[in-house]
Amino acid sequence: MGELFRSEEMTLAQLFLQSEAAYCCVSELGELGKVQFRDLNPDVNVFQRKFVNEVRRCEEMDRKLRFVEKEIKKANIPIMDTGENPEVPFPRDMIDLEANFEKIENELKEINTNQEALKRNFLELTELKFILRKTQQFFDEMADPDLLEESSSLLEPSEMGRGAPLRLGFVAGVINRERIPTFERMLWRVCRGNVFLRQAEIENPLEDPVTGDYVHKSVFIIFFQGDQLKNRVKKICEGFRASLYPCPETPQERKEMASGVNTRIDDLQMVLNQTEDHRQRVLQAAAKNIRVWFIKVRKMKAIYHTLNLCNIDVTQKCLSAEVWCPVADLDSIQFALRRGTEHSGSTVPSILNRMQTNQTPPTYNKTNKFTCGFQNIVDAYGIGTYREINPAPYTIITFPFLFAVMFGDFGHGILMTLIAIWMVLRESRILSQKSDNEMFSTVFSGRYIILLMGLFSTYTGLIYNDCFSKSLNMFGSSWSVRPMFSKANWSDELLKTTPLLQLDPAEAGVFGGPYPFGIDPIWNIANNKLAFLNSFKMKMSVILGIIHMLFGVMLSLLNHIYFKKPLNIYLGFIPEMIFMSSLFGYLVILIFYKWTAYDAHTSKEAPSPLIHFINMFLFSYGDTSNKMLYRGQKGIQCFLVVVALLCVPWMLVAKPLVLRHQYLRRKHLGTHNFGGIRVGNGPTEEDAEIIQHDQLSTHSEEGEEPTEDEVFDFADTVVYQAIHTIEYCLGCISNTASYLRLWALSLAHAQLSEVLWTMVIHTGLSVRSLAGGFGLVFIFAAFATLTVAILLVMEGLSAFLHALRLHWIEFQNKFYTGTGFKFLPFSFDPIREGKFDD
């Protein structure tokens, strides 16, 4: 469990790989996923590195596979994913893969080109078929005497007078249906009404050969007279992207052409079907293997990209690399290198040599599917400094608990728990589906967080005795109204004249003692319910907040002890602990003291702890209306304030002065501190001892002692310490007030829940009729929808964000610097999971 509370111990190691074994060794390290390679060629351009040609070849293969995948998805063919993890191909297998992918790509491109040409030809023949079919009725109307009257404007009056025969030219074609109105207006205006347009809709939509979309089109025929109008009409048709087709003038010719067109369409349809069948066979065969091909190609690309980070000696026979790796995994790394050397057939073993360094290692926190979500919450604020206390284990409990304090409702907690349990039970099936829905994936990745939030909300809901704004009467009430009639002389007249009556717990038998669990359900119907609950939740918020912050300060002690910084303990932790305990810890003691020192008989005389706490800072003790809580309170409070004030210069001045004294003393003695690094020629054996990173000088914000290369700046140290002291002292006040959001959001959630019940469910239950019974079905559906949308989703998200704030700011800033950088090992896991980002 030690690795859960601190990041893993890391070491910098040097790898020496034979050129013929480097590829296989890096492949095995990728399968292991425990080493992070450093770039040893930062000044070398990406395009000038050793294996850039291999990377380009892999990118070209990846491009071809993406093209094939696009065609598979376009054909709605499911891609088979068996979860197989194929081995990395050898470099010599790249030629076969390239040839295979080239063949598939060329075959698909050829099929697509031929299919597009066939579909274009098929579209033209289909349009011509409809033109021949639709225009027959247009020509039949030419023989109608009424047409002569409609088209009389096409003839000159002199020609009409001479009785010249009616000879009109025409063009026929097909146009998109939505362009017909604009097309008709354009013809009318340009030709000044001297054309006659007839159009008819094609019932079935036609497939566009380029896009594959189905388009609704119409057949048209335009009658005109003269070459000038003919040219205008053709230009307009061209502008509207209308397809023009030759149409014979005689019925016999049209009939013969239609017969030939139908025959060609049938033949073409047969060819198209055969082409589509062949395309489907090619794509289905590719769909079975494309996932494996993707993994192979991207593994190869990742390996060559990693090899580009290595140095190559002048003989071109050896590659050297520097890697960060966990100390606990050194044996498994050695075994992986040995396995890679054997696969390559090399006889020279690869060497792993631990190095001495003063560089800060990356932070690596081991996680599993349960702790991963909580670790992500911490890392979102900042990656932990190397080997400092990891807040994630404590967040597992405190985060869902503080969320539940704000969200506490038994009914809502049960719903949230059921949703989380569903995701947990079906996690294997959901993971195998690899959903692309980003919102669902985010919620699913936090399923264990939601589960704990639901369980804790159920618990706090029982404490509040709140279930969908109603109380559960599990043990009966501890209050009784009967003694008030016998001992307090309540009468029927008093009940009639007084709208509100208050039970007196001082009367014997009225209050039977504390409720067995949670809050007495009688408070749900009391008029002063809010006053009682607000007092309870406000004090509870302050108590939880101060305990949470004190725990954070105590965790800083573990950091100081681990990093061997006694100065930070005596001049940092101790005054911080005393300052917070003497002021805000005392406030918690006052609250508990009042709860225990006053009972129902003396509660009327109980003073306000808040007023006493304010007067404590003002040194104001002249108010006789607010009597002292205990004997000697004035002296103790004055002493605590003085102690807290003394802690301020203790934190502000002492540390810079001590650091300056130590610096001058070392300078006088001529000694230097090298941050714990041993100077000299260290061992180069594989099992050589490495420097303990716990003793390294880490760049923290604690003002540590200067190293050999640093110059002590007293002014900077004073300024930094002043900022830290002011931030801590003011933060204690503001952070304590910030925890009042626990009370505020809990109140808001309870009030929203009550409003929803009153405005929706209560309305449905008030209708005492058969219609009301049927209407209650729809009312309950609306209530359920609003409960999930508003109280579970919106209110849940609000409480989640506030819980984040309390952990990131109020809790973690007491001990967590978060200035490290994450350990990013070279691993094939993202490739196997389908996350192909470079």
Swiss-Prot record:
Residue ranges that the UniProt entry lists as topological domain Vacuolar: 408-409, 472-535, 595-639, 751-771
Membrane-crossing residue ranges in chain numbering: 389-407, 410-426, 442-471, 536-555, 574-594, 640-659, 726-750, 772-810
Keyword hit for Transmembrane helix: yes
Domain of life (superkingdom): Eukaryota
Pfam short name (any one): V_ATPase_I
GO MF terms held by the record: ATPase binding; proton-transporting ATPase activity, rotational mechanism
Keyword match Zinc: no
One GO cellular component term: plasma membrane
Chief location: membrane
Tissue and organ expression note: Detected in brain (at protein level). Highest expression in brain, intermediate levels in kidney, and relatively low levels in bone and liver.
PANTHER family registered for this protein in UniProt: V-TYPE PROTON ATPASE 116 KDA SUBUNIT A 1, VACUOLAR PROTON ATPASES
This protein's name: V-type proton ATPase 116 kDa subunit a 1
